[in-house]
Amino acid sequence: MAAARKFREVIDREGLRGEELIRALLPTLAELYGAALDLEDVRPADSPDHKFAMSHDQWDALFRQLGERIGPNACYWTMFDPTEPDQHDDHPVAGHLGDDLADIYRDIVPALKAWDGGDDSIAAGAVDSWRMTFGFHWGAHSVDALRTLHWLEMNK
């Protein structure tokens, strides 16, 4: 929970820009990724965090804002599936830190808001939502973002 809150605080702090934002994101994103690996397998009856979901317009605004805050190095190249390069003609694909961070935020923050509601069933749904979406979505975005942020920090 603490790692999710830290991530949200860094993203929501609009004054963080450029190198300062990159420096704040590195430990925060690494901590969030590590915490996700330890999430318990909780299977609630339902996951009621949908009422806190971000709209596409909200996501798009965050994506654009993060791209501007990161600056000209927001775009990067990566392999979609680094274990099977032949499936993709061995060509890298473009990534964008604004997309990575906005997608992580979209997967994390609604569940955090649900958790803050104090209802145990909502809390269980929040944990399950994080664990599930980590496995198939925001975990990969975290790794791509960390690799790129690391490179930007070490090669400035």
Where in the sequence are the language-model features?
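Long amphipathic alpha-helical segments
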Residues: 41-112
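Acidic, proline/glycine-rich low-complexity IDRs
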Residues: 89-95, 102-156
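Charged, amphipathic alpha-helical oligomerization/scaffolding segments
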Residues: 2-6, 24-31, 35, 61, ...
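Short glycine-rich, low-complexity/disordered patches
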Residues: 16-25, 45-48, 77-84, 122-128
